[in-house]
Protein backbone atom coordinates (compact mmCIF):
# COMPACT_ATOMS: atom_id res chain seq x y z
CA UNK A 1 0.00 0.00 0.00
CA UNK A 2 1.31 3.44 -0.91
CA UNK A 3 0.44 5.44 2.22
CA UNK A 4 2.01 8.62 0.85
CA UNK A 5 -0.98 8.90 -1.53
CA UNK A 6 -3.32 9.59 1.41
CA UNK A 7 -5.70 12.50 0.83
CA UNK A 8 -8.06 14.13 3.30
CA UNK A 9 -11.69 13.36 2.46
CA UNK A 10 -13.81 14.78 5.27
CA UNK A 11 -14.41 15.24 8.97
CA UNK A 12 -17.62 13.87 10.49
CA UNK A 13 -19.08 14.78 13.87
CA UNK A 14 -21.34 11.73 13.78
CA UNK A 15 -21.03 8.20 12.40
CA UNK A 16 -24.22 8.82 10.39
CA UNK A 17 -22.33 11.46 8.35
CA UNK A 18 -19.61 9.04 7.20
CA UNK A 19 -19.42 7.88 3.56
CA UNK A 20 -20.90 4.57 2.43
CA UNK A 21 -19.87 1.59 4.58
CA UNK A 22 -17.84 -0.21 1.88
CA UNK A 23 -14.16 -0.95 1.23
CA UNK A 24 -11.67 -1.16 4.09
CA UNK A 25 -11.06 1.26 6.96
CA UNK A 26 -8.32 1.21 9.58
CA UNK A 27 -8.95 3.49 12.54
CA UNK A 28 -6.37 5.32 14.65
CA UNK A 29 -7.31 5.87 18.29
CA UNK A 30 -5.40 7.25 21.23
CA UNK A 31 -5.45 9.57 24.17
CA UNK A 32 -4.64 13.23 23.62
CA UNK A 33 -0.88 13.64 23.25
CA UNK A 34 -0.22 9.94 22.52
CA UNK A 35 1.28 11.04 19.19
CA UNK A 36 -1.60 10.07 16.89
CA UNK A 37 -1.29 12.95 14.41
CA UNK A 38 2.50 12.60 14.28
CA UNK A 39 2.18 8.85 13.57
CA UNK A 40 -0.31 9.48 10.74
CA UNK A 41 1.98 12.12 9.25
CA UNK A 42 5.00 9.79 9.50
CA UNK A 43 3.08 6.85 8.00
CA UNK A 44 1.92 8.95 5.02
CA UNK A 45 5.18 10.91 4.76
CA UNK A 46 3.11 14.11 4.76
CA UNK A 47 3.97 16.68 7.41
CA UNK A 48 0.61 18.41 7.47
CA UNK A 49 -1.88 15.62 6.70
CA UNK A 50 -3.09 15.32 10.30
CA UNK A 51 -2.76 18.54 12.26
CA UNK A 52 -0.29 18.19 15.11
CA UNK A 53 -1.76 20.29 17.85
CA UNK A 54 -0.15 21.79 20.91
CA UNK A 55 -3.63 21.78 22.47
CA UNK A 56 -4.49 18.20 23.48
CA UNK A 57 -7.86 16.98 22.27
CA UNK A 58 -8.09 19.17 19.18
CA UNK A 59 -9.31 16.26 17.03
CA UNK A 60 -13.07 16.40 17.70
CA UNK A 61 -14.20 14.97 14.38
CA UNK A 62 -13.84 11.55 12.82
CA UNK A 63 -11.37 12.48 10.05
CA UNK A 64 -11.13 10.29 6.96
CA UNK A 65 -8.22 9.97 4.52
CA UNK A 66 -8.45 8.22 1.15
CA UNK A 67 -5.72 5.74 0.13
CA UNK A 68 -7.29 4.82 -3.22
CA UNK A 69 -9.20 1.65 -4.21
CA UNK A 70 -11.83 2.30 -1.52
CA UNK A 71 -9.25 2.03 1.29
CA UNK A 72 -9.30 4.63 4.05
CA UNK A 73 -7.42 5.72 7.17
CA UNK A 74 -9.68 7.01 9.95
CA UNK A 75 -8.49 9.40 12.65
CA UNK A 76 -10.80 9.05 15.66
CA UNK A 77 -11.20 11.91 18.17
CA UNK A 78 -8.28 12.28 20.58
CA UNK A 79 -9.51 11.36 24.01
CA UNK A 80 -8.22 12.50 27.37
CA UNK A 81 -7.67 15.85 28.94
CA UNK A 82 -9.25 17.97 26.24
CA UNK A 83 -10.62 21.24 27.59
CA UNK A 84 -14.24 20.32 26.99
CA UNK A 85 -17.21 19.55 29.20
CA UNK A 86 -17.96 16.06 30.49
CA UNK A 87 -21.12 15.92 28.35
CA UNK A 88 -19.10 16.56 25.17
CA UNK A 89 -16.57 13.90 26.23
CA UNK A 90 -19.41 11.43 26.74
CA UNK A 91 -20.80 12.36 23.31
CA UNK A 92 -17.40 11.70 21.69
CA UNK A 93 -17.12 8.38 23.47
CA UNK A 94 -20.56 7.20 22.39
CA UNK A 95 -19.82 8.19 18.75
CA UNK A 96 -16.52 6.31 18.93
CA UNK A 97 -18.24 3.20 20.33
CA UNK A 98 -20.92 3.56 17.67
CA UNK A 99 -18.22 3.67 14.97
CA UNK A 100 -16.35 0.63 16.33
CA UNK A 101 -19.50 -1.48 16.68
CA UNK A 102 -21.47 -0.49 13.58
CA UNK A 103 -18.89 0.11 10.84
CA UNK A 104 -18.69 -3.11 8.81
CA UNK A 105 -15.75 -1.94 6.67
CA UNK A 106 -13.57 -1.40 9.77
CA UNK A 107 -10.83 -4.03 9.58
CA UNK A 108 -8.51 -2.93 12.37
CA UNK A 109 -7.69 -0.40 15.05
CA UNK A 110 -4.31 1.16 15.71
CA UNK A 111 -4.17 2.17 19.37
CA UNK A 112 -1.46 4.71 20.16
CA UNK A 113 -0.07 4.58 23.68
CA UNK A 114 2.74 6.79 25.01
CA UNK A 115 5.46 4.22 25.80
CA UNK A 116 6.70 6.33 28.74
CA UNK A 117 3.49 5.90 30.73
CA UNK A 118 1.33 3.16 32.19
CA UNK A 119 -1.83 2.16 30.31
CA UNK A 120 -4.65 4.56 31.07
CA UNK A 121 -8.35 3.77 31.48
CA UNK A 122 -9.04 4.74 27.85
CA UNK A 123 -6.33 2.37 26.57
CA UNK A 124 -7.73 -0.54 28.59
CA UNK A 125 -11.24 0.27 27.37
CA UNK A 126 -10.12 0.25 23.71
CA UNK A 127 -8.32 -3.09 24.15
CA UNK A 128 -11.38 -4.61 25.86
CA UNK A 129 -13.68 -3.30 23.12
CA UNK A 130 -11.45 -4.69 20.37
CA UNK A 131 -11.52 -8.11 22.04
CA UNK A 132 -15.27 -8.11 22.67
CA UNK A 133 -16.06 -7.05 19.07
CA UNK A 134 -13.44 -9.45 17.64
CA UNK A 135 -11.48 -6.65 15.92
CA UNK A 136 -7.85 -6.60 14.83
CA UNK A 137 -5.85 -4.34 17.14
CA UNK A 138 -2.27 -3.14 16.78
CA UNK A 139 -0.83 -1.19 19.70
CA UNK A 140 1.82 1.39 18.82
CA UNK A 141 4.00 2.23 21.82
CA UNK A 142 4.89 5.74 20.69
CA UNK A 143 7.77 8.10 21.53
CA UNK A 144 10.06 5.07 21.95
CA UNK A 145 13.07 7.18 20.88
CA UNK A 146 12.87 8.80 24.33
CA UNK A 147 13.46 5.44 26.08
CA UNK A 148 16.69 3.54 26.70
CA UNK A 149 16.87 -0.21 26.02
CA UNK A 150 15.85 -1.15 29.56
CA UNK A 151 12.82 1.16 29.43
CA UNK A 152 11.82 -0.21 26.01
CA UNK A 153 11.85 -3.73 27.43
CA UNK A 154 9.70 -2.50 30.34
CA UNK A 155 7.18 -0.93 27.94
CA UNK A 156 6.88 -4.23 26.05
CA UNK A 157 6.46 -6.15 29.31
CA UNK A 158 3.74 -3.75 30.47
CA UNK A 159 1.59 -4.56 27.41
CA UNK A 160 2.45 -8.26 27.60
CA UNK A 161 1.36 -8.60 31.22
CA UNK A 162 -1.83 -6.60 30.59
CA UNK A 163 -2.80 -8.81 27.64
CA UNK A 164 -2.26 -11.93 29.77
CA UNK A 165 -5.37 -10.97 31.73
CA UNK A 166 -7.52 -11.74 28.66
CA UNK A 167 -8.39 -15.14 27.25
CA UNK A 168 -8.53 -14.20 23.57
CA UNK A 169 -5.74 -11.92 22.33
CA UNK A 170 -4.77 -13.62 19.07
CA UNK A 171 -5.92 -10.58 17.04
CA UNK A 172 -3.77 -8.19 19.09
CA UNK A 173 -0.20 -7.21 18.28
CA UNK A 174 2.07 -4.45 19.55
CA UNK A 175 5.37 -2.75 18.82
CA UNK A 176 7.62 0.15 19.77
CA UNK A 177 7.41 3.16 17.46
CA UNK A 178 8.86 6.63 17.02
CA UNK A 179 7.49 9.24 14.61
CA UNK A 180 10.63 11.30 15.10
CA UNK A 181 13.22 8.66 14.16
CA UNK A 182 10.84 6.45 12.10
CA UNK A 183 11.77 3.55 14.38
CA UNK A 184 9.39 0.64 13.70
CA UNK A 185 7.83 2.30 10.64
CA UNK A 186 8.49 -0.58 8.21
CA UNK A 187 7.09 -3.14 10.65
CA UNK A 188 4.02 -0.95 11.16
CA UNK A 189 3.42 -0.63 7.39
CA UNK A 190 3.71 -4.41 7.00
CA UNK A 191 1.03 -4.91 9.66
CA UNK A 192 -1.32 -2.40 8.00
CA UNK A 193 -0.74 -3.98 4.58
CA UNK A 194 -2.17 -7.28 5.87
CA UNK A 195 -5.35 -5.46 6.96
CA UNK A 196 -5.83 -3.78 3.57
CA UNK A 197 -5.35 -6.97 1.53
From Swiss-Prot:
<dbReference type="InterPro" id="IPR019987">
    <property type="entry name" value="GTP-bd_ribosome_bio_YsxC"/>
</dbReference>
<keyword id="KW-0547">Nucleotide-binding</keyword>
<comment type="function">
    <text>Necessary for normal cell division and for the maintenance of normal septation.</text>
</comment>
<feature type="binding site">
    <location>
        <position position="37"/>
    </location>
    <ligand>
        <name>Mg(2+)</name>
    </ligand>
</feature>
<dbReference type="GO" id="GO:0000917">
    <property type="term" value="P:division septum assembly"/>
</dbReference>
<keyword id="KW-0460">Magnesium</keyword>
<dbReference type="InterPro" id="IPR030393">
    <property type="entry name" value="G_ENGB_dom"/>
</dbReference>
<feature type="binding site">
    <location>
        <begin position="177"/>
        <end position="179"/>
    </location>
    <ligand>
        <name>GTP</name>
    </ligand>
</feature>
<feature type="domain" description="EngB-type G">
    <location>
        <begin position="22"/>
        <end position="197"/>
    </location>
</feature>
<dbReference type="GO" id="GO:0046872">
    <property type="term" value="F:metal ion binding"/>
</dbReference>
<keyword id="KW-0131">Cell cycle</keyword>
<dbReference type="InterPro" id="IPR027417">
    <property type="entry name" value="P-loop_NTPase"/>
</dbReference>
<feature type="binding site">
    <location>
        <position position="59"/>
    </location>
    <ligand>
        <name>Mg(2+)</name>
    </ligand>
</feature>
<dbReference type="GO" id="GO:0005525">
    <property type="term" value="F:GTP binding"/>
</dbReference>
<dbReference type="InterPro" id="IPR006073">
    <property type="entry name" value="GTP-bd"/>
</dbReference>
<keyword id="KW-0132">Cell division</keyword>
<dbReference type="Pfam" id="PF01926">
    <property type="entry name" value="MMR_HSR1"/>
</dbReference>
<keyword id="KW-0717">Septation</keyword>
<feature type="binding site">
    <location>
        <begin position="75"/>
        <end position="78"/>
    </location>
    <ligand>
        <name>GTP</name>
    </ligand>
</feature>
<comment type="similarity">
    <text>Belongs to the TRAFAC class TrmE-Era-EngA-EngB-Septin-like GTPase superfamily. EngB GTPase family.</text>
</comment>
<feature type="binding site">
    <location>
        <begin position="57"/>
        <end position="61"/>
    </location>
    <ligand>
        <name>GTP</name>
    </ligand>
</feature>
<dbReference type="GO" id="GO:0005829">
    <property type="term" value="C:cytosol"/>
</dbReference>
<feature type="binding site">
    <location>
        <begin position="30"/>
        <end position="37"/>
    </location>
    <ligand>
        <name>GTP</name>
    </ligand>
</feature>
<protein>
    <recommendedName>
        <fullName>Probable GTP-binding protein EngB</fullName>
    </recommendedName>
</protein>
<keyword id="KW-0342">GTP-binding</keyword>
<keyword id="KW-0479">Metal-binding</keyword>
<feature type="binding site">
    <location>
        <begin position="142"/>
        <end position="145"/>
    </location>
    <ligand>
        <name>GTP</name>
    </ligand>
</feature>
Amino acid sequence: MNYSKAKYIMGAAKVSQLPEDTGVEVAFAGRSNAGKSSALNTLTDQKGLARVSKTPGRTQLINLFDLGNNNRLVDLPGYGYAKVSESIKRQWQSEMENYLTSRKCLNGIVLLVDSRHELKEFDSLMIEMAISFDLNLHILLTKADKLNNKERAQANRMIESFLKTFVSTDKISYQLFSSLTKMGLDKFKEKLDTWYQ
